[in-house]
Design a protein with these regions (language model features):
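Long, contiguous binding/interaction regions
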Residues: 1-57, 64-93
Length: 93
């Protein structure tokens, strides 16, 4: 397994952000990964509108996942309406 960090921008208009964060953690766990940390950065103004919204809720996830599962994670999160964007990077040890 490899270590990854993923910065996600979620819908800031949703009432329960912790529920959305838990759903993303569940997706990672269902793909065989382990989440070591999820750090909510809070609501921030976007540099440009995304889906006609000007604010997003930023969350940084640290997790381990098999490299073969990263494309599936991107696909699943891309289908979620509450996930505006995500950027996943490999953490060098």
């Amino acid at each position: 397994m490899r270590k990854y960090e993923m910065l996600s921008i979620l819908d800031a208009g949703t009432e329960n952000q912790s529920e959305e964060i838990a759903k993303i953690e569940d997706v990672i766990k269902n793909l065989g990964g382990t989440v070591s940390k999820s750090d909510a950065w809070g609501k921030k103004t976007l540099a440009y509108p995304i889906r006609k919204k000007t604010e997003g809720f930023y969350v940084l996830f640290s997790f381990e996942l098999e490299p073969s599962q990263t494309s599936e994670l991107r696909r699943i999160l891309g289908l979620r309406a509450y996930v505006y964007r995500q950027l996943m990077t490999v953490v060098d040890e």
